[in-house]
A protein has these predicted regions:
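A SIS-like phosphosugar-recognition module
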Residues: 1-162
Length: 164
């Protein structure tokens, strides 16, 4: 995740990067990444005070996927601006929850996450109604794991720290 953000910022010159977790328990993950990356890498000079020749890091933003789908996903799909995103999703609900309604809800969350990644990549052509046309070819990374556990969360945090 971290190295991809460096690539997108420095070499593709994309100024922002979105983090979209499809798990309410990860609601603070985008804010954590903002604090980590933007405070550390949001400077215009290096440690010796020399002006940087390349951008240091992107603007990091995001929200839980279910909220994001109804607010800014249309912009991600249809805007003239391109913003890469990471879509984060556990494929199974938390252990110990045997309620079928919970399992069905979580399955729909995972399906939505995969569908968003697919739509960003492939688009949804609709030339008859241009306001509904999705071009596709929008950069996104779908990061999935089995269940959200402390171990899985640690791995996710480690992926975010690779370039720091």
């Amino acid at each position: 995740m971290g190295l991809i953000r460096v690539w997108c910022r420095r070499y593709l010159q994309l100024p922002a990067y979105g983090l979209i977790p499809y798990d309410q328990r990860l609601v603070a993950f985008p804010a954590w990444a903002q604090q980590l990356e933007m405070e550390s890498n949001g400077k215009s000079v290096d440690r010796q005070g020399h002006t940087l020749q390349l951008p240091a890091g992107p603007l990091i933003w995001g929200a839980v996927g279910t909220s994001a789908q109804h607010s800014f996903f249309q912009w991600l799909h249809q805007s003239v601006d391109i913003t890469p995103i990471d879509i984060l999703v556990a494929m199974k609900p938390p252990a110990g929850l045997d309620d079928q309604v919970w399992h069905d809800h979580h399955k729909l969350l995972a399906i939505n996450a995969v569908a968003q990644a697919e739509a960003l990549a492939l688009g949804a052509p609709n030339m008859a109604e241009p306001h509904r046309h999705f071009q596709g070819n929008r950069p996104s990374v779908l990061i999935s794991w089995d269940q959200t556990t402390p171990y899985a969360l640690g791995r996710l945090l480690a992926l975010s720290l690779i370039h720091i």
